[in-house]
Amino acid sequence: MLLLGVAALPMCLFAQESNDSVPASWERELELNEVVVVANRPVVKQQNGKIIYMVKNDPYAKGLDGITILDRVPRISVSNGTVSVAGKGNVRYIIDGILMELDASAMAMRLQNLRAEDIEKIELLPNPPSRYAAEPNAVYISITTRNETLGTKGSIYGSLNQSDKLREYFSGSISHTTRKCDMSLDASVSNYYNTNYNDIEYSFLDGFPSRVSSTGTKSHMVESGFNALFRYKFAPDMNIGVIANFNYESVTSKGTNFTDYGGYISSSKSITKSKPNNALTLTGFYDWTFGSKGESMQLTYNYFNRHSPTVSDITTIYSNSAEDYGVNEEGKTNYRFHSMKADFKLPYRWAQLEAGMAYTDILNSSVNSLMSATMNRSEPKRESNSFDYSERIAAAYITASRNLGAGFWGKVGLRYEYTFTKGIQRSEGSVDRDEYGHLFPSINLSWNKDRIGSFNISYSMGMGRPNLWELNPFEYYSTADEYAAGNPNLKPTVYNNAEINYYGLGGLYTVLYTSFASDAIGYIRRFDETGIISTKPYNCLFTNKAGLYVNYRRTFFGRWEMKAGGEVFRTSSRSEVPDFKIRSMKDWSGKVEVSTNIMLNRPRTLIFSAQFTHFFPWQQNLINYESFQLFNLSLRYSLLNNRLNLQLKANDIFGWNKTRSKEHYADYTIRQKFNAHTAYVLFGISYRFGRDKVNGVWRPSKEDQSVRTK
């Protein structure tokens, strides 16, 4: 979560020395009589199953923020703030050991607050570590900030983003490190306007007139938050601390919908408010390194609380009726998590062992009410529901890794999770209970040879639990005759993932991957006898995806960098649900991508970048998608020894980023076109202050379930 404003921190009253480290000669770029001497150091390498991107060795990283710079890591693509990894599903982030448990928008703001100049390296972990909760085909991106000597440092960043409306964003951070304590504070505030349009056509196979609807939504979101850390060091090998994280959202959405039913039309207006939407995370931790071999223990407690109230009003006018139809919904949802974790590292001569155990208690309480009425109805129709859901997860894990000699390295891991769930629908008086346990093995084997490159083969098993809002059975209306609801009977989905990858030959990266799942969650739309459309999730899909991704990067003349890549994959989806007309789909597809970076001046401080990606038609979860393109340009300028950075960026200037899809049901076909209005022009400015040689102040919170609340 990114964070608002820069606030001064109280200084610890402990003596400290100013011991600035001096970079080695190969780390420095020297200007002597206008002759620039640049030493080439490895920018990317693959080691122990990880792709490692050394940011400090990359001259093209100047002025980039923490999200844009991810696009420079092989296999990672960044588009309009969305990060994806070829062959993978969920993307999780670790910053200096902190597993970031944020929703997509808050995570994007957190990354934007990072500067390339403050990042030491970025690691891509395709095989999820056993110490973290089992997830579906997950990939972890670990960012390590520069960790040097004592002192104070900070940064501020601001941007203006012109899309349909002007958007503003501001953030800042400050940290202070002494011999006895660490302190840090991040803060941010944003004021965003978004517009999107969604056109849907239902073509019925029985000759009934098509149903065509067009929906426009304009939303305004104000978001702010902060993250604070305090750590006290009893000794170099023992410390205790606390982390506080708070996020505030206020969202107002106004929508219009026009629907042609073939014989009559309807017009709807809606307004939805969600405010204040608050989330608080508190973490207490104790770290102790003991023994002659560097054995360590970490104890962590997490508390998470999210409060999400919503109010929605919908008014609909039908051309064949003189009455207005209104729907009013009010809801309050509270999430409370408690978790305790103990992690141990035992570096023996014969293997590096990691082991631990965890317990998580999840409580979700929702109260919802719905009122619908026509103008001349004396008594409106009222419905209400109270849904309470609890989930308790006990877990234990162990991993062992070691060098096997002759360039080989191996790692095996095993995690066990046992889960108890209970759901209560008080309006119906029903109680659903379930319990299940599962083992999640993982294995990783790599081989490195300097002149040949690095090969890595891995296998892992993961599990995707339903999002908490997917379990809530209450109906949320978007128009007077269309709603979405959850399904309290959803079960978790088990995923099997395997891949072989290679890096070498001066910048070639390639990966062959596969992932398959049974009883995956899919969404099904249905019409009732009155023509009302419902959308609900079900465990109804069997999916498989296998593909080959290749990426190559090369620098010419020391100033011009080119990157080209492509992906070819085969997807398979199958369902036994009779709602679908086509219950099995198999298809080949792929993408091509090319990007360039050019240094435009002698000091190498002015960099022009361009990026283009073309996606070919593909199918996913029995839905056919048409091709589309992504295109963006940027110009970055660094001043004051890289402390001041200016950026000008243009995204989707030709309006190519639109999603078109088709679904085949037994009785009808759905054609959909979604335009998120991603075109914008952005001007950003960042400034770093304080000493350059300062510790990064972070510590892992290890809270890993709050992502399921949004």
Predicted regions and their residues:
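Short strand-turn segments of transmembrane beta-barrel domains in outer membranes
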Residues: K56-N57, L150-I174
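Outer-membrane beta-barrel signature, preferentially recognizing the C-terminal barrel domain
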Residues: F387-Y389, M463-L512, F516-S518, S534-A546, ...
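Face-selective signature of the C-terminal outer-membrane beta-barrel domain
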Residues: C181, G225-E249, K273-Q425, S446-N456, ...
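C-terminal beta-signal and adjacent terminal beta-strands/loops
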Residues: Q16, L639-K710
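Short, acidic, small-residue-rich periplasmic hinge/interaction motif at the N-terminus
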Residues: E17-N57, V78-N80, K88-N90, P126-N127
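Short acidic/polar hinge/loop motifs at secondary-structure boundaries
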Residues: G66, R72, L99-P126
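Extracytoplasmic beta-strand/coil segments of soluble accessory domains associated
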Residues: V44, I67-L102
